A protein has these predicted regions:
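C-terminal interaction appendages of subunits in large macromolecular complexes
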Residues: 1-290
Length: 290
């Protein structure tokens, strides 16, 4: 047993001397590494099983998307889906009654969502799941950066319908402006659609469709009618011009573009827009007799 221990001790001393030699010399260390790699190669090397060669140019075969007319619908709970054209036309009255937003578009189009925060959110129609009439759909938050708990939808349309159009913006602080739709052409999923003061938000966005006059309505029931041309055409990055002088604690509630049938319901009473006094922008307006 003593001889075995002496033998083991000598072997340990030899290894210590060998390791010191390796650690003390870069050349010796490289030699050991090369010897170890050569031993591994000799034991485990096998002929290459694959062939490396120049291949033909890669070609991606993407089948063309079949363009179809669809209908984007969004309910009051924020769930959206796509209906095919025939399903919508068979059930148009039901769909128009049950859904908050109904937009006809192509499946290759984009849905444009303008929010009270002044942001524009875009969703590819192809990303919206197709569904049947009674299918629930998916939350619109799942398809965009829009957050319905912190924001609200003011205007919803499709990119195709925006081309060549002009939108009129109005905020609760009575800032108004006209903006050419090309200002909103972008591939980004979210952009700023307008500039807002602190505490302000968008209350109305409407497309100009031949109307020549505008009516502003405040939270206290004051109305101001004036020519649309008095609202400046500005960039999306501008705040706009003041549309009406507001009283203390008063806010702008809504903007109307006067069309062929300028009658609205206000507190259960009909208000004929064309009977309002035609004034100038940035006036005080007047209350309507009910």
């Amino acid at each position: 047993e003593i001889l075995a221990l002496e033998k083991e001790h000598k072997e340990t001393l030899r290894r210590i001397a060998e390791y010191k030699k390796i650690l003390g010399s870069r050349e010796e260390m490289n030699r050991v590494i090369k010897d170890d790699l050569a031993a591994i190669k000799e034991e485990f090397s096998v002929p290459r099983r694959t062939l490396i060669e120049d291949g033909p140019e890669a070609v991606y075969d993407e089948s063309a998307v079949q363009v179809q007319e669809v209908v984007f619908v969004l309910d009051r709970f924020g769930y959206c889906k796509l209906l095919d054209k025939s399903t919508y036309e068979r059930n148009q009255e039901t769909v128009d009654t049950e859904q908050v937003h109904v937009i006809r578009c192509l499946n290759t189009d984009k849905i444009c969502l303008f929010a009270a925060s002044g942001s524009l959110y875009q969703i590819k129609a192809m990303d919206v799941p197709a569904g049947k009439l009674r299918d629930k759909g998916v939350p619109i938050e799942n398809l965009s950066k829009y957050d319905g708990t912190k924001d609200s939808i003011v205007y919803l349309t499709c990119a195709q319908d925006l081309k060549g159009a002009t939108l009129v913006f109005a905020t609760k602080m009575a800032m108004v402006k006209q903006v050419p739709a090309e200002e909103f052409e972008t591939n980004n999923r979210m952009v700023a659609a307008t500039k807002l003061q602190d505490g302000d938000q968008v209350v109305s966005i409407l497309p100009v469709e031949g109307q020549e006059e505008v009516v502003l309505q405040t939270t206290s029931g004051v109305f101001l009618r004036f020519p649309l041309e008095e609202i400046s055409v500005l960039k999306k990055a501008s705040r706009g011009v003041r549309g009406i002088k507001l009283a203390k604690n008063e806010e702008l509630e809504k903007l109307y573009l006067i069309g062929d049938n300028p009658v609205i319901d206000y507190k259960g009473k009909e208000v004929h827009m064309n009977r309002l006094k035609l004034a100038k922008r940035d006036g005080k307006g007047s209350k309507v007799r009910l």
